[in-house]
Amino acid sequence: MENVQILWDFMHMGQALEQADVSVGFGCYDEDIPRRCAELFHRGFAPYVCFSGGLGRNTDKLWTKSEAERFAAIAMAAGVPENRIILENKSTNSAENLLFTPKVLAEAGVKAERIIAVHKPYMEKRLLASMQVYWPDVQAVYSSPQVSVEKHIAHAEQIGMTRKGVIETIVGDVQRMELYAQKGYQVPVEIPNQVRNAFDALVAQGYTGQLA
């Protein structure tokens, strides 16, 4: 797991929390994301929660209900009032998340000058790089469920992901850091040699199922 940990640590930023207008939970297979958003709501960091996601990579094989709707149900079970939740349930990838979410918030009359962007721990850096292309005028702090890589994998296995599938998704998202920057989907981020070597080792071991 050493190479997986190297990728995880590179992608995870661990920024300090700040007050925001709304927390935005980005859809995926990780059901700890709405729990983190609920925690931030109850701690008073943001008075509204927006969940963004239809069905996309991985979840289209797991669920029939949209990521946003599934996350909202989890947040409400954790005590977030329904009238404090905004849903964007049409997006199928990160770019659409970032294009559709500001429109949904504006339509709901929710100010979104400052947000807490909540994603998987290993998506924080990629989300930041994408946000600068698709939602550049928003001030954002990046957060995620406070879990280790092993705990993240264990939770993912509970909802139908496989251990290999999670590791492949981590590998695929690291690949997209460079690939998507070349395509203009996110700003470039320098990738250290240690991260490149860990990525290459995992690809050589067969973790290729989520490569673009």
Where are these regions (language model features)?
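A structural signal for short, hydrophobic/glycine-enriched beta-strand patches
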Residues: M1-V166
